[in-house]
């Protein structure tokens, strides 16, 4: 199911890029002092999904928590953006562009992994047919643009669904004595990440 999830992310991104070029939108978030969205670079294609909270995640990835209003944004996602953005920047891509690309890749890979974990979780709870249906509905849900953008939604979906997967998998293995192995991992994933 991860392939379907990744394919749909690409389609959503293409749709957003087309709309971003043809539709004038109201976006007051670009008034931030440093938006880190280059205007004349290959990142123009990615600009269609760098809106609203994405700017704050990029700001935290670049400069850390400089302003009080930025403290509302959980640090895991910006830390991953910074880590992978610096690796991508080694290829010669501008830092801003590499951070945007890193954020997109993190979101897309997290969503693909969340789709796979949704399928596995649903197989434990339901039949395989219902597992496929629920996963396809998860993949094509109307909030798909948030799963494709530089938001924590995909990463947190992956972590939450993975935690639930281990919880229910542990319940099915409990009689076999294997819960001792999965309980600490399940609790860590579901409760502390």
Where are these regions (language model features)?
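Start-transfer (signal-anchor) and selected internal transmembrane alpha helices
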Residues: 1-38
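Transmembrane-helix signature of polytopic, membrane-embedded enzymes
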Residues: 93-102, 113, 118-140
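Transmembrane alpha-helices of multi-pass, membrane-embedded glycan-processing enzymes
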Residues: 77, 81-88, 103-117, 156-159
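Short hydrophobic/aromatic helix or loop-helix immediately within or flanking a transmembrane segment
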Residues: 48-93
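Specific aromatic-rich, kink-prone transmembrane helix
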Residues: 117-120, 137-140, 155-190
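Residue-level signature of the transmembrane alpha-helical core
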Residues: 2-6, 10, 79, 104-109, ...
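Intrinsically disordered, low-complexity domain-flanking/linker segments in eukaryotic proteins
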Residues: 28-38, 89-96, 171-185
């Amino acid at each position: 199911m991860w392939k379907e999830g990744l394919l749909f992310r690409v389609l959503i991104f293409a749709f957003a890029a087309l709309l971003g070029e043809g539709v004038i939108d109201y976006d007051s978030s670009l008034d931030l002092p440093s938006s880190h969205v280059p205007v004349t670079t290959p990142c123009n294609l990615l600009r269609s999904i760098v809106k609203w909270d994405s700017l704050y995640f990029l700001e935290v990835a670049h400069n850390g928590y400089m302003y009080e209003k930025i403290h509302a944004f959980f640090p895991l996602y910006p830390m991953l953006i910074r880590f992978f953005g610096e690796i991508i920047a080694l290829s010669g891509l501008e830092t801003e562009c590499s951070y945007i690309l890193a954020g997109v890749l993190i979101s897309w890979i997290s969503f693909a992994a969340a789709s796979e974990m949704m399928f596995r979780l649903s197989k434990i709870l339901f039949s395989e047919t219902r597992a496929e249906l629920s996963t396809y509905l998860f993949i094509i849900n109307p909030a798909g643009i948030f799963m494709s953008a530089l938001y924590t939604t995909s990463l947190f979906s992956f972590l939450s669904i993975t935690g639930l997967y281990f919880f229910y998998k542990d319940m099915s293995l409990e009689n076999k004595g294997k819960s001792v192995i999965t309980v600490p991992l399940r609790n860590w994933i579901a409760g502390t990440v």
